[in-house]
Amino acid sequence: MSQPAIRKNHMDVLWHEYTDNNGENIPVTQASLTEKASIIGRVGIMLLSCGTGAWRVRSSMNTLAEAMDVTCTADIGLMSIEYTCFDGEDGFTQSLCLTNTGVNTSKLNRLEHFIRNFETEGKTMSGNQLHDLLDSIEEIHGLYSPIALGIAAAIACGGFTFLLGGGPIEMFCAFVGAGLGNFLRCKLTKHHYTLFLGIVLSVSFACLSYAGLLKLGEVFLHLSVQHEAGYICAMLFIIPGFPFITSGIDLAKLDMRSGIERLGYAMIIILVATMSAWIMALILHLQPVDFLKISLPLSDWILLRLLASFCGVFGFSIMFNRPVPLAVTAALIGAIANTLRLELVDLINFPPAAAAFIGALTAGLLASLIKNKAGYPRISVTVPSIVIMVPGLYLYRGFYNLGIMSLATSATWFASAILIILALPLGLIFARILTDKTFRYCT
């Protein structure tokens, strides 16, 4: 017996119904205010679905509004836009919502091209033709299969493990655990399962896979139980670095609603993920002990950190649906910036938060240098290049110690994590202030 279809909680917007009757051959600049506003609002909500911040969404909506000779004001959050368009005589107000949020740089890049070329190409098209073009852009889903995204998470978390102090055994176990965990997460997302279920199951599966591999190693290879330290690294693919960082950028531009909503979304993911990992640790008798010490010459440390940082950023970039050339660009920037951050801490005893600020500032400046040559939005390069600096290990250890009522230790880990999380968007913000005059002023 077939299951009844699940009724959608958010109804689909039939965009072509907003076009004027008999307006197929009329340029959109001569269309009604309703038709113009439908183009502006649809582009805005599509940009928002790609994960970009409120300032960028509003800027793009303004570009289209100016080209069509209307005025647009917009209030933008994480999942919705309320906007009004004026043409000097009438006003049109609409509220648009997303069903889910995520990151899709491939779609974002196509939308950026659409906006850049609108003045020369889009103004001559009819509203119906523009909606047809937006239909084709909206169909751009993930570039990669769940298997490929699982491998990307495995590469990222394997590199992450080394940067946190893990050795080959921890890296291999985290590689397998993260790969399986993110594969499951992608399959659940593809079938539209709710956010909480996806987080709990994927994190639990990653931790279980790590623990299972380690137990096999203990039985057959007589591995030390201290290698359990890396189980945290198997779940770091879930850390929401993108909304964490974009929330800081939005708050810097006083887009309070978007910034607070993005921060709240990131905190929800952190809370559910760390609680799931903590419960799995209790069930599997795992503890976040220190990694076994690795002794290497300074030159080897630097080279291996460059390589591990490259792998980590490359993997996260693929998870954010970036094309391979763009992922490589972000990985090169991230390798330089993150290695600089780590060496500042190790060689001259820089406070970790200050080093994180300099690392993020470096990433932002490097991204600005290649922005025009790369032809991609700046955020597509800057955010992935510093996501690897988000202190997921600190956040988990803070929650783990909170769970066992070691409150002083928990506060120490949380304080360290908060300082670094604050420093990362500040570094990108100051890089943007230094290199982008449109961002420098309050407009």
Regions found by a protein language model. Name each.
Residues 1-132, 136-138, 142:
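Soluble N-terminal domains of membrane-associated systems
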Residues 128-141, 155-166, 185-193, 284-297, ...:
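Short juxtamembrane and helix-loop transition motifs at transmembrane-helix boundaries
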Residues 143-246, 319-320, 324, 329:
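Core alpha-helical transmembrane segments of integral membrane proteins
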Residues 147-151, 171-176, 197-201, 263, ...:
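Hydrophobic alpha-helical transmembrane segments
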Residues 159-164, 180-188, 205, 209-217, ...:
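Alpha-helical membrane-inserting segments
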Residues 161-177, 226-240, 292-308, 348-362, ...:
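Structural signature of hydrophobic alpha-helical transmembrane segments
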Residues 217-226, 284-299, 401-412:
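Membrane-interface helix termini and inter-helical loops of multi-pass transporters
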Residues 230-235, 246-250, 254-270, 332-443:
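C-terminal transmembrane helix-loop-helix hairpin of multi-pass membrane proteins
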